[in-house]
Amino acid sequence: MSKPPPKPVKPGQVKVFRALYTFEPRTPDELYFEEGDIIYITDMSDTNWWKGTSKGRTGLIPSNYVAEQAESIDNPLHEAAKRGNLSWLRECLDNRVGVNGLDKAGSTALYWACHGGHKDIVEMLFTQPNIELNQQNKLGDTALHAAAWKGYADIVQLLLAKGARTDLRNIEKKLAFDMATNAACASLLKKKQGTDAVRTLSNAEDYLDDEDSD
């Protein structure tokens, strides 16, 4: 009876390491990597041999080598987003690193991309179908709060076009509009809030009209 095929790894369950030393394979199945390479571990079901990918190549790595000779990267997508490193971010996504993972502050990679003003990173993250726009971190801030506070009107515009909520308050009870540090951001947010308010009022009037017609 043949072994069942391994289950595909779920996004977010990928472990990421940076190699501290070069590893020379002894068999064709093993993965070659050099010092400084990023390794994405996708299968740890065998305690001795883990399956990993580096630079687009996939192979086996002795688990003890990874444990002893590699440095764990806890939030690679966040690191790529903070640095504005588009190629690393794309590599993380290609290797199924979870797009909505939270760091110790409760922030997403999208939050850090907006905080740093990295428009190309934001656009790349927006290509992910399950991207969470409105995640609030431990301070209650969303990606929209970060973009408004840092004064990146182009990113505020992107977030609003994607459907980011303007009515979420952080733990200081501040909306993204309250955090805006320049007129361009404030204007975009005020306009969107006004549109949303009109839409809500219109919906309420429709509801009342329906009741009247009963």
Curated annotation (Swiss-Prot):
CC annotations in GO: extracellular region; ficolin-1-rich granule lumen; secretory granule lumen
Spans of repeat ANK: 72-101, 105-135, 139-168
Residue positions where Phosphoserine is found in the record: S202, S213
Gene Ontology biological process: ossification; signal transduction
Pfam families the record matches: Ank_2, SH3_1
Species lineage: Eukaryota, Metazoa, Chordata, Craniata, Vertebrata
Descriptive protein name: Osteoclast-stimulating factor 1
Quaternary structure, from the entry: Interacts with SRC and SMN1. Interacts with FASLG.
Positions of modified residues (Phosphothreonine): T200
An MF annotation (GO) of this entry: SH3 domain binding
